[in-house]
Regions:
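Membrane-embedded alpha-helical bundles of multi-pass enzymes
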Residues: 2-215, 256, 410, 421-424, ...
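Soluble catalytic domains of enzymes that build or remodel membrane lipids, polysaccharides, and related
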Residues: 213-482
Length: 507
């Protein structure tokens, strides 16, 4: 007679690497456009469980697999810009995107290694796991040019946790989210170590619920009318010389349909020509709106002669009804500048995209003035940098962000981008006006609610109202430093507990 045996420990360990990969694949479903936020908690819990009883080498592999699943799925839209609009063969675009995801996966790999390397005898500490997660997110958003995408807290924007954003920004949302997931994973093993993380997570959820309805800022003026034209010009046609006049005609026609006394915001590089070449047209449009009690703000490429060298900028300008010019600071690698261009230029079309030789703007630039309001401008993915937005919003009444997400087609990329922009409104207690070429064009209130939105891939004008705001949220005053300090304190507390446990065992 043959007796059945339970699965061996080695077999269970072999299952934990696929479990880590599965956990990573689940996490993007928690973000827009899907928004199944409980999957983020499940993803974190499964990731934490996969590290239980792991060696350091196993932890490194499982963390990397988690990151590969998360980024491989979550930013798969990168290949769309490479292939559809960058002229890169699919046989190259997919591996290049995979290589990018594999590099980003090194951050979760380091997290997993740290969690196991400094784990107490009963397994990884949920406190150290959560604290290190946040600190590595900070590093990922800063290292090289930074890639602050898919932070866990963004998945919670439509939950009670969004009330934490004015207090500690995306960092406090992420810390509470990871504490919750790690506590759930630890509780499944019936470990007492789950208790401190669970208590902190409950405090976070309670604080979010309590502060969600509160207003940290107040109206500075009466509601203002705004109009956001969405030209919906196909990306493969935008930069063709034959489209220049057609593009002018499209925006002139859309703008002519707007009633008087509106702040009109055209999207990023609305005109695919330099501002000095289109000066007469732009000034005429701005003057017409100013005479009607409105103002025009437009994205436009600009150039500036500095000595013998010409510098090119991705800019946004007020043209009538105000004043100001802002040059984009955070440039997109390969899209707006090419690292190691002496080596990479000419290798494949993706390294020679139109307008990929921009110069970054100075951090000392002033905000814009339009219709007697101070406007904080952000171009494209500048809006995903929380500290940049909180800093520039200090003396402003409203946030505006202009973008052209046509690069990413019907993928999840534009939805993730918009979700992050919404949280900037909550962090700063200000309305956010988002003007894009083909979507997502929208008006967002200071609590992150979408007040009005145009469908993607349509040519139309979004009309609405917003309220200029004044005041500062705690996050604007203090930035992310208090939460980073808390994350570090959680790591240190876990190390102290580990040392104390070892001391008791030795004695």
């Amino acid at each position: 007679m043959t007796l059945a045996h339970p699965p061996s420990a080695s077999f269970r360990h072999r299952l934990r690497s696929p479990l880590a990969l599965l956990a990573g694949l689940l996490s993007p479903l928690a973000f827009a456009p899907w928004g199944f936020w409980p999957l983020m908690l499940a993803s974190i819990a499964l990731f934490w469980l996969s590290l239980h009883s792991a060696t350091r080498r196993q932890a490194l592999l499982r963390g990397w697999l988690y990151g590969l699943g998360m980024f491989g799925f979550g930013i798969s839209w990168v290949h769309v810009s490479m292939h559809d609009h960058g002229g890169t063969p699919m046989s190259l675009a997919v591996p290049m995107t995979g290589l990018f995801a594999a590099g980003l996966a090194l951050f979760p790999a380091l997290l997993a290694w740290l969690a196991v390397r400094f784990a107490p005898q009963d397994g990884p500490s949920p406190l150290l796991f959560a604290g290190a997660w946040v600190l590595l997110d900070v590093l990922r958003g800063w290292m090289l040019t930074g890639f602050p995408w898919l932070y866990a807290g963004y998945s919670m924007i439509d939950t009670a946790l969004s009330g934490l954003a004015p207090l500690g920004g995306i960092w406090l949302l992420t810390l509470t989210t990871v504490l919750t997931g790690a506590a759930l994973g630890s509780a499944l093993l019936r470990r007492r170590a789950a208790l401190p993380a669970a208590v902190l997570a409950l405090i976070g959820w309670g604080a979010g619920l309590a502060t969600d309805p509160l207003d940290f800022t107040e109206p500075a003026a009466a509601p203002t009318r705004v109009a956001l034209p969405q030209g919906n010009i196909p990306q493969d046609l935008r930069w063709q010389l034959s489209m220049r006049q057609a593009t002018r005609d499209i925006y002139a026609e859309l703008t002519a349909s707007i009633p008087p006394e509106h702040l009109v915001i055209w999207p990023e590089s609305a005109l695919t020509e330099f501002a000095d070449d289109a000066a007469d047209f732009l000034l005429a449009q701005g003057q017409s709106l100013a005479e009607q009690g409105g103002a025009l703000i437009s994205g436009i490429p600009t150039r500036e002669q500095r000595g013998l060298q010409t510098h090119y900028f991705n800019s946004i300008a007020v043209l009538g009804g105000g004043e100001g010019l802002y040059h984009k600071q955070k440039l997109v690698p390969f899209g707006e500048f090419v690292p190691l261009q002496s080596v990479l230029r000419g290798l494949i079309p993706f390294f020679d995209l139109p307008m990929s030789s921009f110069t970054p703007g100075s951090p000392e630039q002033l905000n814009l003035l339009a219709m007697y309001m101070v406007v904080s401008p952000f171009i494209c993915y500048e809006i995903v940098y929380p500290e940049l937005v909180a800093d520039r919003a200090q003396d402003s009444n409203v946030l505006i962000t202009i973008s052209n997400d046509a690069w990413f087609g019907t993928s999840a990329g534009p939805h993730q981008h918009f979700q992050m922009a919404r949280l900037r409104a909550v962090e700063t207690g200000r309305w956010l006006l988002r003007s894009t070429n083909n979507g997502i064009t929208a008006i967002v209130d200071p609590h992150g609610a979408v007040v009005a939105q145009l469908p993607q891939f349509t040519r139309d004008v979004l009309l609405g109202e917003f309220v200029p705001m004044t005041g500062h949220t705690p996050y604007m005053r203090l930035g992310g430093t208090p939460v980073w300090g808390l994350a570090l304190a959680l790591c240190l507390s876990a190390l102290v507990r580990r040392a104390a446990t070892r001391a008791r065992v030795d004695h």
